[in-house]
C-alpha cells in the first residue's frame, strides 16, 4: 500500500466518522434546558358543561331576586325618609348621582381609572379647588431633579493606591519587628530601633497622606492593638518582682545534705475526709441561726470591751459634812477639813424618821426594777440618807455594781440601794463618842431632821408613809411583780450561759459513743427531709380538687332536694288518705 492509498483510506474513515457524529452514542457535556410541556386544553364533557350553565343561571337568578327585593324595599320607603336621605346626600356630597356623572365627564381622569370609577376620595367627588392646587404643585415639582442622599463613590486615584501600598508595607514591617522583639528578651538598647521605626512610620504616613483622608478600618485596628501592647508593656515594667536570694552552690548543698541525713523522713498523711451528708432545709436554717447567734455574741463582747475601755472609773461622791445629799450636776465642793467628818450627829429616834426609813427602803425596792437612768432620781437619793442599824461598816463608801453588768454605775448611792446595803449614818466608830463631846458640836453641823418638824405639823393626823408603802417584814417572801418587757433585755448578755454551748472543736468522737450505747449508726440511713411532698400541690391539682368537691356538693344538694320532694309527696298522700277516711 503506497502513501496515496493510505491517505484515501484515512479520508474515507474520517468521512464515515463525521457522518455518524449525530448518531453516535456519547455523553453530552452540554445541558439543554428541559422541554416545556404544553398543556392541551381539555375539552369538558357535556354533563359538566350543563352543570356549569345551570349554576350560572342560578347565580344570575339569585342576583335578580336580590335586586328586586331592594327595589321593593325602596318603593315601600315613605317620602319623608327619602327627603331626609336626599338632604344628607346633598350635604355630604358622597355617592350622589349627579356628582358621579360629573366625575365621569371630568377630563382629568388620570392614573388609568376608568370612567365612573372614584378618583381619590369621597367616592368620586372632585373639587375644582383641590385639582387646581394639585396641578400647581405638580408643575412646581416637575422640574426638580432627584437629590441623592449619598455622594457617588469617587474612583481611587493613583495617589491613593500608592498610599495604601505604603501603609500595608509599614504594617508588615512593624509586625515583623514586633515578632522579633517578642522572641528575644527586650533590653534597654532595643528601645532605639523601635523609636526609629516609629519615626519611619510617621514619615511614611506623611508621605501618603492626601488632601482627603480615607477611613481604613484595618489601620484603625492595628493602631488599637499597638496601643494595647504599649499599655501592657508599661504595666509589666511597673510590677517589680522582689529580689530572690542567690541559688545555693554545690558545697552548701552538700553541707545541708550532711545535716539532714540523720533526721528521720516524716510523711504527713492527709486525713481522708468522708463525704458529709447534705443538710436538709430545716438543718440548714438551724445552722444559719447558730452562726447568727455566735456573730451577735462576738459583737456584744466587742461592744462590752470598748465600753469598759471608754467609761472612766466613777469616783464615789462622799457625803458633805453637813449631811446634805450632793447633787450630780453640782460642781465639786471645796476640800473640807479632814476632822469635819469625825464630828458625830445625834441620832433621831422619832416616829417621823422611822417612817422616812421605811419610805426610802420601799423606794429602793421599786428603783431596782428600773434602768440605770432612773436610779439617779431623787427618790433613790433619799435612800442613802436613812440609817440602817443592822448594816455593816465595810459597806461605807464602796459602790456595788448593779445586776450582772460589769460597767460601773455612775451614781454610787443608787448602786448601794439596789444591792440593799445602805451605809450607816452615823458610822459605828462615831456613835461611841461620849455625850460630853456631842454637846460641844455646833448647831450648824447637825443634820437636818427628815421630814422637818414644820412639815410634820402640816401633815397633822394623816398617816405617813401610807399603808401600801410600809416596810415588809424580813421573813415575808418578796412580791413577784410582772416584769415590763423591754427590748434592751434581749441584748443583755448573761455570763452564766457562757459554758452552756461549747462551740470549740471536741476531741472526743461523741457519735462513736452514741453508736456503742444505742447501736445507732447515722451513716446507714439516708438524710431524707421530713417535709411531706404530698402536702404540696400545683395550681392544676387544686383546681381539679375544687371541681370534684363542687361536683360532689351539687350531687348532695340535688339528692337533698329529691328527698325533700319525696317527703312532701308522702305527706300530701298521708293527708289525702286521712281526709278521705
Curated annotation (Swiss-Prot):
Q: Which GO terms describe its biological process?
A: nucleosome assembly; transcription by RNA polymerase I
One matching Pfam family, short form? SPT2
Q: Which residues form a coiled coil?
A: 36-76, 276-307
GO cellular component terms given for this protein? nucleolus
Q: Where is the composition biased (Acidic residues)?
A: 486-495
Q: Which cysteines are joined by disulfide bonds?
A: none
Highest taxon of source: Eukaryota
UniProt lists compositionally biased (Basic and acidic residues) regions at 162-181, 218-236, 256-312
The UniProt entry, under InterPro entries, shows: Chromatin_SPT2, SPT2_N
**Bias (Low complexity) ranges:** 26-35, 352-376
What would be an example GO MF term here?
DNA binding
**UniProt keyword list:** Coiled coil
Instruction: Please list the residue ranges that the record marks as compositionally biased, kind Polar residues.
Output: 182-197, 204-213, 447-461
Instruction: Please give the residue ranges the record annotates as the region Disordered.
Output: 26-50, 145-495
> What's this protein's family per the entry?
Belongs to the SPT2 family.
What protein name is recorded for this chain?
A: Protein SPT2 homolog
Q: Which organism is it from?
A: Drosophila melanogaster (Fruit fly)
Amino acid at each position: 500500500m503506497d502513501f496515496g492509498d493510505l491517505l484515501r483510506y484515512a479520508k474515507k474513515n474520517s468521512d464515515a466518522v463525521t457522518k455518524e457524529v449525530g448518531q453516535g452514542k456519547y455523553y453530552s457535556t452540554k445541558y439543554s434546558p428541559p422541554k416545556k410541556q404544553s398543556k392541551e386544553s381539555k375539552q369538558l364533557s357535556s354533563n359538566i358543561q350543563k352543570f356549569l350553565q345551570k349554576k350560572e343561571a342560578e347565580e344570575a337568578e339569585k342576583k335578580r331576586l336580590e335586586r328586586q327585593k331592594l327595589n321593593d324595599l325602596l318603593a315601600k320607603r315613605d317620602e319623608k325618609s327619602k327627603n331626609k336621605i336626599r338632604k344628607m346626600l346633598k350635604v355630604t356630597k358622597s355617592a350622589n348621582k349627579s356628582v358621579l356623572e360629573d366625575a365621569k365627564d371630568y377630563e382629568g381622569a388620570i392614573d388609568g381609572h376608568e370612567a365612573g370609577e372614584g378618583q381619590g376620595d369621597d367616592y368620586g367627588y372632585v373639587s375644582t379647588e383641590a385639582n387646581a392646587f394639585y396641578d400647581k404643585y405638580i408643575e412646581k415639582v416637575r422640574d426638580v431633579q432627584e437629590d441623592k442622599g449619598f455622594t457617588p463613590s469617587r474612583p481611587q486615584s493613583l495617589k491613593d493606591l500608592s498610599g495604601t501600598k505604603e501603609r500595608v508595607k509599614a504594617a508588615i514591617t512593624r509586625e515583623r519587628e514586633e515578632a522579633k522583639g517578642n522572641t528575644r528578651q527586650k533590653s534597654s538598647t532595643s528601645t532605639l530601633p523601635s523609636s526609629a521605626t516609629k519615626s519611619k512610620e510617621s514619615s511614611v504616613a506623611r508621605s501618603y497622606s492626601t488632601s482627603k483622608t480615607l477611613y481604613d478600618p484595618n489601620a484603625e485596628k492595628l493602631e488599637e492593638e499597638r496601643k494595647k501592647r504599649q499599655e501592657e508593656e508599661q504595666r509589666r515594667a511597673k510590677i517589680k518582682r522582689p529580689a530572690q536570694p542567690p541559688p545555693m552552690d554545690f558545697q552548701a548543698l552538700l553541707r545541708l545534705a550532711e545535716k539532714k541525713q540523720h533526721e528521720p523522713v516524716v510523711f504527713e498523711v492527709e486525713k481522708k475526709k468522708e463525704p458529709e451528708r447534705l443538710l436538709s432545709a430545716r438543718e440548714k436554717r438551724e445552722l444559719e441561726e447558730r452562726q447568727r447567734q455566735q456573730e451577735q455574741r462576738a459583737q456584744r463582747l466587742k461592744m462590752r470591751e470598748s465600753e469598759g475601755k471608754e467609761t472612766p472609773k466613777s469616783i464615789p461622791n462622799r457625803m458633805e459634812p453637813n449631811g446634805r445629799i450632793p447633787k450630780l450636776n453640782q460642781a465639786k465642793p471645796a476640800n473640807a477639813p479632814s476632822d469635819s467628818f469625825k464630828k458625830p450627829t445625834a441620832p433621831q429616834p422619832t416616829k417621823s424618821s422611822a417612817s422616812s426609813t421605811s419610805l426610802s427602803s420601799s423606794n429602793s425596792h421599786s428603783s431596782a426594777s428600773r434602768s440605770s437612768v432612773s436610779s439617779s432620781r431623787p427618790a433613790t437619793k433619799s435612800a442613802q440618807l436613812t440609817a440602817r442599824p443592822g448594816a455593816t461598816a465595810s459597806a461605807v463608801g464602796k459602790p456595788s455594781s448593779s445586776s450582772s453588768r460589769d460597767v460601773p454605775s455612775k451614781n454610787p448611792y443608787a448602786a448601794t440601794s439596789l444591792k440593799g446595803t445602805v451605809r450607816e449614818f452615823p458610822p459605828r466608830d462615831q456613835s461611841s463618842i461620849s455625850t460630853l463631846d456631842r454637846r460641844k458640836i455646833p448647831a450648824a453641823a447637825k443634820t437636818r431632821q427628815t421630814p422637818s418638824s414644820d412639815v410634820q405639823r402640816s401633815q397633822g393626823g394623816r398617816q405617813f408613809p401610807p399603808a401600801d408603802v410600809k416596810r415588809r417584814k424580813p421573813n415575808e417572801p418578796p412580791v413577784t411583780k410582772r416584769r415590763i418587757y423591754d427590748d434592751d433585755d434581749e441584748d443583755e448578755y448573761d455570763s452564766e450561759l457562757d459554758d452552756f454551748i461549747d462551740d470549740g472543736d471536741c476531741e472526743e468522737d461523741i457519735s462513736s459513743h452514741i453508736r456503742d450505747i444505742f447501736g445507732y449508726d447515722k451513716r446507714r440511713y439516708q438524710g431524707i427531709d421530713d417535709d411531706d411532698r404530698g402536702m404540696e400541690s400545683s395550681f392544676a391539682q387544686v383546681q381539679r380538687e375544687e371541681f370534684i368537691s363542687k361536683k360532689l356538693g351539687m350531687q348532695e344538694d340535688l339528692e337533698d332536694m329529691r328527698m325533700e320532694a319525696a317527703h312532701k309527696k308522702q305527706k300530701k298522700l298521708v293527708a289525702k288518705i286521712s281526709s278521705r277516711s
